[in-house]
């Protein structure tokens, strides 16, 4: 008998991150409760400094909470030691950042296969997975190129492929189109829509309402807390309608 997978990809309870103390205490994330179902796309919006990027860093294991709980696929991760947390980042979480964070001295395929190699996969398996992902995101013809030879949209596609290298439970995207023009933004959002349709769980931090409109659920943050939550009921047709806004 097999054990059923947890319904939730991510859950937080009372998640808090503070900086400073006394009168200088800042609550970057303030007692946040969040649940993200498997296969769901959640967008988080809010003004600069509201805590949305800090929230992403906490749930992805890039930073430690001051208090509260984080469960990833039913596993409590806020209590993990540094070594276990580093392993989790390599295997269960994929990151897509605004600034790409590709290694310019490595080829495109070497960038994509790196997380799998670090997680202990064989070079042959890591390379095969990387090439399949590059084909999936439409830049397999750039496998041997350096990132500096790619356009912004192509580099972000490579970053998405790298984030998927270890088939993560959760992909976290922090302003993934912030450095892209409208055409490249449309390409990346179409890719996210394909990921959504394949059942990938996504949490996207963005300032762009059109990008947020492609999600299943929109959460608004202010001063470290959730102040509004809206379920977007348009389904696939609604998301594709939002994408059409980039074409006009």
Q: What do the PLM-derived regions correspond to, one by one?
A:
Residues 1-18, 231-248:
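ABC-family P-loop ATPase nucleotide-binding domain
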Residues 7-215, 221-226:
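ABC family nucleotide-binding domain
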């Amino acid at each position: 008998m097999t054990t059923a997978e947890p319904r939730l990809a991510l859950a937080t309870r009372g998640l808090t991150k503070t900086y400073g103390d006394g009168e200088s205490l800042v609550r970057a994330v303030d007692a946040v409760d969040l649940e993200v179902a498997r296969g769901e796309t959640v967008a988080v919006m809010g003004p600069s400094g509201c805590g949305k990027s800090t929230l992403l860093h906490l749930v992805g294991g890039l930073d430690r909470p001051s208090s509260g709980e984080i469960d990833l696929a039913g596993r409590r991760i806020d209590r993990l030691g540094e070594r276990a947390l580093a392993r989790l980042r390599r295997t269960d979480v994929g990151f897509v950042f605004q600034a790409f964070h590709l290694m310019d001295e490595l080829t495109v395929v070497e960038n994509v296969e790196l997380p799998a190699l670090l997680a202990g996969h064989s070079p042959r398996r890591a390379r095969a997975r990387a090439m399949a992902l590059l084909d999936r995101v439409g830049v397999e013809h750039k496998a041997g190129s350096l990132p500096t030879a790619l356009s912004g949209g192509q580099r972000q596609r490579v970053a998405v492929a790298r984030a998927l290298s270890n088939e993560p439970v959760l992909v976290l995207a922090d302003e993934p189109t912030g450095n892209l023009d409208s055409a490249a933004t449309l390409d990346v959002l179409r890719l996210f829509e394909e990921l959504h349709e394949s059942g990938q769980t996504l949490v996207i931090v963005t300032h762009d309402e059109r990008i947020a409109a492609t999600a299943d659920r929109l959460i608004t943050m202010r001063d470290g807390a959730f102040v509004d939550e809206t379920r977007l009921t348009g389904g696939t047709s609604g998301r594709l309608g939002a994408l059409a806004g980039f074409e006009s």
